[in-house]
Regions:
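N-terminal cap/leader regions of alpha/beta-hydrolase-fold enzymes
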Residues: 1-239
Length: 239
């Protein structure tokens, strides 16, 4: 069985103390790295579990803290307030995400020239925004992410983009899916959208229904299929 190391990484953004989690295979090798951007609830065992799965597939992973160390384990209403705060200034959010990319690239266990990002729900929007920033990143994957554009001057998208979407997600209606497709086409980037029928928001989270939000529920088949496609995507990026 592959050894797995897990370490907290302290960093800052505009004076805010953040604490991301680096999950690696325990060796001294610099491997392709995947930044995992969590849901509105911030860094949890769910994302750390996803990171451990990535290590098993030959990647090291940084579970990104974008909300701040003081919000770890905070109540749902508090976290939704923080999500709204960050989402209200997409230019600042972009800079926050670019700072996380810099942190990831600064880890000796991650090959700074081979980095991808993936995100869930609000984190999916963040992953897309990282691509939209024109960052020098290999690819991004959005899982049940939000597609609304940032309203910032467009940059040349260097990353390959894949979005895994539940067709019945009430937060992302079909016109938003079409709008993302048009946006990515106009940006001339390499993009994919995978839509899963009978699937809502939060479909990768076995505890999604605990949020008690209409249209938010776990779908095992979509979770399995999307992660299988993710690994094909990462293999295409990094070989």
């Amino acid at each position: 069985m592959k050894s797995i190391d897990q370490n907290n990484i302290a960093h800052e953004f505009n004076g805010e103390s953040l604490e991301s989690v680096l999950v690696t295979d325990g060796s001294d090798r610099a491997l392709p790295g995947v930044i995992i951007i969590p849901t509105v609830m911030g860094v949890t065992d769910l994302e750390i579990g996803f990171a451990r799965e990535l290590v098993g597939h030959g990647y090291n992973a940084l579970v990104a803290d974008i909300f701040g160390k003081t919000f770890r384990g905070a109540p749902r209403d508090t976290m939704f307030g923080e999500m709204n705060r960050l989402g209200s200034d997409r230019a600042s959010l972009r800079e926050r995400l670019l700072s996380v990319l810099e942190v990831a690239g600064g880890q000796s266990e991650i090959d700074s020239g081979r980095i991808a990002a993936m995100g869930f729900c609000f984190g999916g929007k963040c992953a897309l925004d990282l691509a939209r920033s024109g960052a020098d990143i290999a690819g991004v994957a959005s899982f049940h992410g939000l597609f609304d554009p940032p309203g910032l001057p467009p940059e040349k998208i260097k990353a390959k983009v894949v979005a895994f979407h539940g067709w019945d997600d009430p937060m992302v209606p079909p016109d938003a899916v079409e709008a993302l497709a048009r946006e990515m086409t106009e940006a001339e980037c390499d993009w994919q959208i995978h839509a899963y029928g009978h699937t809502g928001h939060g479909f990768t989270n076995p505890k999604a229904a605990d949020l008690q939000i209409d249209g938010v529920f776990y779908t095992q088949a979509a979770a399995r299929r999307s992660f299988a496609s993710l690994y094909l995507f990462l293999d295409e990026l990094f070989g």
